[in-house]
Regions:
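A composition-biased, non-transmembrane "mature-region" signal
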Residues: 1-168
C-alpha cells in the first residue's frame, strides 16, 4: 500500500521513453528493489508513495521511493501512448530537527546556512547513492528490453541531469 509522499528538494533527474514497449510498473519496482538488495547499500529503505498526476482531484500514481538518510529517489514507470517511460527524481528530504528548522520563516534558512555543514563526504556519498540506484535502474531496464528484443539504452540515454548538487 502506497502512502502520501512529501516533496524533496530535487537536484537530479532522469527519464526515458521506450517506443513500442509495454511492461508492468510493479514488476519493474520489485526488480529494482532486488537489484538494490544485491548492492548492499547501507541505510537503504524502500517504500511505495503516491503522487497526484495533477491537482487535488486528479488520479494518483504510485512511485517506488528509495531513501538513504536524507536523500530520496522517487522512481516512476508507466505507459505513455504506445510506449513506456521510466523516470527518477533524486532530492534531499530533511528529517528530524532540520525538517522543523526548514519551516521557520527567515530564521530557518539562515540557521541552515550557518549551522548545517555540507562536506565532501556528504557530496561523495550522495553521488555514490545516485550511481548505485542509477545502475540498478539501468540494469533492470536492460534486462526488460533485451527480453523483448529491444536495443539497450546508450550511455548518453542513461545520463542523469544534475542540478545544484555542488551549490548546497
Amino acid at each position: 500500500m502506497a502512502r502520501k509522499a512529501r516533496m524533496a528538494d530535487i537536484f537530479s533527474h532522469w527519464y526515458h521513453l521506450i517506443e513500442n514497449f509495454q511492461a508492468s510498473a510493479k514488476e519493474f519496482y520489485a526488480a529494482v528493489e532486488a537489484a538494490l538488495q544485491r548492492r548492499q547499500i547501507p541505510d537503504l529503505k524502500t517504500s511505495r508513495v503516491d503522487w497526484r498526476e495533477g491537482g487535488l482531484l486528479s488520479a494518483k500514481r504510485e512511485y517506488l521511493r528509495i531513501k538513504r538518510k536524507e536523500l530520496v529517489f522517487d522512481i516512476s514507470a508507466a505507459p505513455f501512448g504506445t510506449g513506456f517511460f521510466f523516470s527518477w527524481w533524486l532530492g534531499e528530504l530533511p528529517s528530524g530537527f532540520w525538517a522543523l528548522v526548514s519551516i521557520i520563516p527567515f530564521f530557518g534558512p539562515l540557521m541552515e546556512l550557518f549551522l548545517r555543514r555540507h562536506t565532501y563526504y556528504k557530496a561523495d556519498t550522495a553521488l555514490m547513492f545516485q550511481e548505485s540506484v542509477r545502475a540498478a535502474v539501468n540494469e533492470v531496464i536492460d534486462q526488460m528490453t533485451s527480453a523483448k528484443g529491444i536495443r539497450a539504452l546508450t550511455d548518453l540515454e542513461k545520463k542523469p541531469i544534475l542540478r545544484e548538487l555542488y551549490r548546497r
